[in-house]
A protein has these predicted regions:
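Catalytic core of membrane glycerolipid acyltransferases/transacylases, capturing the structured
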Residues: 3-58
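Solvent-exposed, flexible loop/coil residues
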Residues: 1, 16, 41, 51-54, ...
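A short beta-turn/loop motif at secondary-structure boundaries
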Residues: 1, 39, 203-205
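Non-catalytic C-terminal accessory region of glycerolipid acyltransferases
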Residues: 62-211
Length: 211
C-alpha cells in the first residue's frame, strides 16, 4: 500500500496533476479530495470525497471515506491526499503562501494501514489577488479558484517527487500524529527546487485547528 502526500498551492491544478501522475504510474489509485472535485468528470471516478464542514453530515461522510480508503489500502492500493486540507494561503496577504498545519486524519490513516508514504512537492502559488481575497471574503476566494485554474492552463507545473518513506521509518510517530505530520510536511517542502528559507505554517481558516 502507498499513500501519496503533497502540498496544495493551487487548489484545482495540483489535484488534476496528482491524478495524472498516479494514473500513469498506478492502475489501483484513489484521491481523497474535497467533494467539489466530483464535479470534474475526468477525476470523479477516482475521488473519495471528504468534507471540511463541521456538521454531522460532514463527519459521517469523512468516517465512511476513511473506511473506504483503509479498505483500499489493505488491498495494496494507492491513495493520494493533500494533508493541509485547503489551498496554501499566506498568513499575511503579501507573505509567502504555505500550507497550514497538516491534518492528523492522514497520520491516523498511515498508522492504521502500514503504508509507505511518497512526498510530492508542487512548486508555485496562486495570484496575489487570490491571496488578498482569501483574507477578505470566503465566497470570493472560492469563486476565484476557477479563474486561478484558467490562468494556469497550458503553462508548465514544476513537480518534485521524493523517495518513498517506509512505514518502519515512521514507526517512531505511531502515537504522535502531530509529530508525524510535521515531519512529513517538512520532508515535502524540502523537495522545493529553490530551497525555502522557512517552513512556517500558512494561514489556518478553521478555528478548531488554530494553535
Amino acid at each position: 500500500p502507498l499513500i501519496v502526500i503533497a502540498n496544495h498551492p493551487y487548489g484545482i491544478l495540483d489535484g488534476l496533476t496528482l491524478g495524472h501522475i498516479l494514473e500513469h504510474t498506478r492502475v489501483d489509485f484513489r484521491i481523497l479530495a474535497n467533494s467539489v472535485f466530483r464535479k470534474a468528470e475526468e477525476i470523479n471516478r477516482v475521488v473519495l470525497p471528504i468534507s471540511f464542514d463541521e456538521d454531522k453530515e460532514a463527519m459521517a461522510l469523512n468516517i465512511a471515506t476513511r473506511k473506504r480508503a483503509l479498505s483500499y489500502l489493505e488491498d495494496g492500493g494507492a491513495i493520494g491526499i493533500f494533508p493541509g486540507g485547503t489551498v496554501s494561503t499566506a498568513v499575511r496577504p503579501f507573505a509567502k503562501p504555505m500550507d497550514p498545519g497538516w491534518r492528523n486524519f492522514t497520520a491516523r490513516m498511515i498508522a492504521k494501514s502500514g503504508a509507505s508514504v511518497l512526498p510530492i512537492y508542487f512548486d508555485g502559488h496562486t495570484s496575489r489577488l487570490f491571496q488578498i481575497a482569501s483574507h477578505t471574503h470566503n465566497t470570493l476566494r472560492m469563486g476565484l479558484l476557477i479563474k486561478e485554474f484558467g490562468r494556469r492552463v497550458d503553462t508548465p507545473v514544476r513537480v518534485s517527487i521524493g523517495e518513498p518513506i517506509s512505514s518502519g521509518a515512521l514507526s517512531a510517530f505511531a502515537k504522535d500524529s502531530k509529530g508525524m505530520m510535521d515531519f512529513l510536511r517538512k520532508a515535502t517542502y524540502e523537495l522545493s527546487p529553490d530551497p525555502l528559507k522557512s517552513f512556517d505554517l500558512g494561514y489556518e481558516f478553521e478555528e478548531r485547528h488554530r494553535m
